[in-house]
Amino acid sequence: MARKKTIFYETIEYIGPRPQLQKRRNRLGGWVIVSIAAVIGFWFGRPLVPSLRATQQSASVGQVGQVVSALEKSALPGAQLASAALEYSKRDVAYDASYYKIGFPMGDVAADKGMAADVIVRCFRETGIDLQELVHNDMKAHFNRYPQLWNAARPDTHIDHRRVANLQRFFERNGEALKPSRHAMDYAPGDIVVWSLASAEKHIGIVVPGPEGSSHQPWVVHHLDDEVRWENVLFDFRIEGHYRYHGKKID
């Protein structure tokens, strides 16, 4: 039923300022802006968190000798590789992922240049194992079983062993592949770990003991950005692969 009009609202005349409706505050808009800012800050700041944490948890070069001495007395299969990685962490190496033509076997880029995969290759060479030669031989015999990510038609001795995806496949095929976990007790010195970074890029490093006071913790030696580091970041990224490899010695 339609509401009946009253004479009251028709006959009384209001004299004064015209009433103004009070504007309702748009609280939703403010929350949307805050939420967007938070998402942007999280997304772009997330890659920085491990680096900031690593700055607080990295070890000094002076502590390397103590841990290396302990590893030399160890009977662990990966002790020699872990020692080589710790010694490598003292080197001044600029990050450079460029393609270079190098010799074969035992070829290498300039000693003051390198990237993540070079840490693995150079440290294994200190134990008498040349991954450049081993990866090439395996790719030559089983090329289609390796990642087809670079539009290559054949193996390339200049770069194949310097690609993390190829090293990962080599260790899967020729080493011991362990189930990735977030339990420190599952990792031993000399283990190889492959991570997936926030950018989805693959990264690789070598597990080593921590410095005095943290020797019970699995730390890593790796080359992520501007320098080679020995630091406590094993679980800062998503672990994609965990391997042990103690291959044949080079003749």
Predicted segment positions?
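Low-complexity, Gly/Ser/Thr/Pro-rich intrinsically disordered linker/tail segments
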Residues: 215-251
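N-terminal targeting leaders characterized by basic, low-complexity, disordered sequences
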Residues: 1-12
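N-terminal capping segments
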Residues: 10-16, 23-26, 45-170
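A structural signal for short, hydrophobic beta-strand segments that form beta-sheets
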Residues: 132, 207, 238-241
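Post-transit mature regions of eukaryotic precursor proteins
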Residues: 1, 24, 30-31
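...with weaker cross-activation on analogous glycine-rich loops/strands in unrelated enzymes
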Residues: 140-221
